[in-house]
Amino acid sequence: MNNDTKINTFAIHTLGCKVNLFESNSIKNDLIMNGLVEVPFDSKADVYIINTCTVTNKADAKSRLYIKRAHVQNKDAIIIVAGCMSQVNKDLMDKLKISIQIGNKYKNSVFDLINEYLKKRERIYRVENILAEKKFEQTTQDFIFLENTRAFIKIQDGCNFMCSYCIIPFSRGRQRSQKMESILEKIKTLVSKXFKEIVLTGVNTAGYLDENNNTFFDLLNNINKLDGDFRVRISSLEPFQINDEIIDLVTSNKKRFCQHWHICLQSGSDDVLKKMNRKYTTDEFYKLMQKILNKSPLTNFTTDYIVGFPTETDEDQKKSIDFLNKIKLYDMHIFPYSKRNNTRSSHYKDINDSTKKDRVKEITKLNYLNKKENLKKYIGKTCEVLFEKKKEDEKMWSGYSNEYCRVMVESGDNLENKMLKVRIKKIFFDSLVGEIID
């Protein structure tokens, strides 16, 4: 590229969590508003943006792969690397021939950074000390959409808990939250645009606390008071942050709040939980689930789960299997343990990969069986389903129930973005099939 080069196209690839997805959409929106055209990542573009993840070694490897892929697509392109891997790895710029490296700050400034690069023709490194960040950074786009039915709102960022295996406090910084009034206004806007499901997302969602000391309960309570035909789904929660106030509010307002709780477990062994620096026991986790189920019996629970934590023994695995059989979660995001630099567990003796693989297979098989078992409780029951899409050349519409079950019905009508009651008739693989109740 020479000094007169004009950029017209960009491509972006996102790795990792919903928060990253949210921020990528904000970057995308800003570039489009400034006249750039998005093209697929596997085609030639003037600018490539890779919004990275570093939660596991696999995430790092994928991030590097997409950076290299961008170079192959266009050796003269501007390569921008952002996100968590970029935040904690200072040596990426030289190793991977990056034009612009930012972390989790300055994602709102990508267009300005591109112009700065074009003007100076010098590589730009803007990675700040994320642990010093105290204010929630507003994005250029307030929310993102999925399937034209669901919208995500990022309510907070960062985490104050130093779990021994986790790199997130170093890549995302300390906890900081968006003002409650701002969130409420965004929800009103989304509802006026006919969105039926709002997903509250963040790094540590239940740790929400804005500068006016509004808590997560305060936020939910005020959302519950809003007018409109919509429901709210809450993303990842820590078990020790779920109090009776939150449980009572969510379970007693089933039309407003989805009866689906994603509560982070991470291990079914108390010894492992202690070494992970998790702030609960398996018994406390079980009692929390029972408290919720007593008030809302059809509730589904999902979780994140780490297999093969350093020092995890065969006995720990057995205890975990027994506990998972006891609580029968609806679904789990299962990760083999991955050593992260600067975390406490990186100094522990790791277990071998073959043992990890065997244990992952065992937990994955159990997860499949428990999901099937959970689905049985819905047969003959009525669920409220938000329909999203229809398979091409078929009459089967699919959507998600309040409890986060995939539900399919046959209909010749257009059901997109309609919230309808469905009587469940049978299980089909990992989904439910039913009929619409008039």
Swiss-Prot record:
Gene3D superfamilies: Methylthiotransferase, N-terminal domain (3.40.50.12160), tm_1862 like domain (3.80.30.20). It catalyses: N(6)-L-threonylcarbamoyladenosine(37) in tRNA + (sulfur carrier)-SH + AH2 + 2 S-adenosyl-L-methionine = 2-methylsulfanyl-N(6)-L-threonylcarbamoyladenosine(37) in tRNA + (sulfur carrier)-H + 5'-deoxyadenosine + L-methionine + A + S-adenosyl-L-homocysteine + 2 H(+). The gene is mtaB. Residues 145-382 form the Radical SAM core domain. [4Fe-4S] cluster 1 binds at C17, C53, C84. This is Threonylcarbamoyladenosine tRNA methylthiotransferase MtaB. Pfam families: Radical_SAM (PF04055), UPF0004 (PF00919). It comes from Malacoplasma iowae. It is found in: Cytoplasm.
